[in-house]
Structure formats: structure tokens, C-alpha cells
Amino acid sequence: RKAKRRVTALGLKNVEDLAVMDAEKLEFPDNSFDVVMAQYVVTAVPNPEAALDEFSRVLRPGGELIILTRISADAGLRRFIERRLQPVVRPLGFRTAEFTWSRYAQWLATAGEMELVENRPIPPLGHFSLLRIRKTAIAVAA
């Protein structure tokens, strides 16, 4: 409701519609969008891979999934610190220590029709990253 009021108050004519739905079960047909933008979503949903699969499903071939998120270190001091902080930040809804780059890479390897275009750390500290992932083809059912 707040977003709809804001669209009206600001006169945002480019916003056609707003909808609330489960990121793991999107109510859109296959191949609906040229771009899917997921800001700080992947680490907040119960089953991130299911959400990533849904984002891929609703993308048209050639479309891009743009993710802005926190990506944890796979190893080293930063990984140690992130794991130590996890009990403190998890009750706040942050599961960032669970989301290393290798988890995204594993999803990409199994997603089939998705390819990484860009993985850019966001300044100043690089704890957040911008991922651009392109859908290369329509998935074929097995």
C-alpha cells in the first residue's frame, strides 16, 4: 500500500502496476520480462535457488537478471568474521554467511540457460556485489 501511495504522490507514470507475491512462486507467465531486478532479495527468501529459478523462468531469452546483494567470502579472515557474526545478524533476517560466491556459481552451473555477464563489487568495501546474469535460451523440459 505504501508503494502504491508513493507512485500516486510522485506521479510516476512509468509504473504500470505493483504486485506482492512469493519470490519462489511468481504469478507471471514464462518469458514475461526483459529484466528482473532483485535487490537484497536472494538472502531474504527461505529457498534462494527456487527464487533464482523463478527469476530465470520469467525472463525472456536475451533478458537479464540483475542482482544486488551481499556475497560472503568463500574463505579467509572475512569468511571467519562473517561466520562469527551470523548468530547476531540471522535473527534480523540476514543470512549473508550462507551466500558465498560458490553458491551462486553452483546455481549457474545447474541453471543451464543462464550465463554470468558481470560480477562487480560495489564500493567502498566491496561487501556487496552487482551481478548481471543473461538468459541465453529457453529451457527445455526433461
Model-derived segments and their meaning:
Residues 49-61:
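A short glycine-rich, Lys/Arg-flanked "PGG" loop and its adjoining helix->strand segment in the class I
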Residues 1-25:
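Class I SAM-dependent methyltransferase SAM/SAH-binding core
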Residues 11, 46, 60:
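Short conserved AdoMet
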Residues 130-142:
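C-terminal lobe and adjacent flexible extensions of AdoMet/dcAdoMet transferase-like proteins
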Residues 68-124, 129:
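C-terminal alpha-helical "lid/dimerization" subdomain adjacent to the S-adenosyl-L-methionine
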Residues 19, 37, 66:
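Conserved Rossmann-like nucleotide-binding pocket used by diverse enzymes
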Residues 34-47:
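A short SAM/SAH-binding and catalytic strip from SAM-dependent methyltransferases
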Residues 21-35:
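A short acidic, Gly/Pro-enriched loop at the edge of an enzyme's catalytic core
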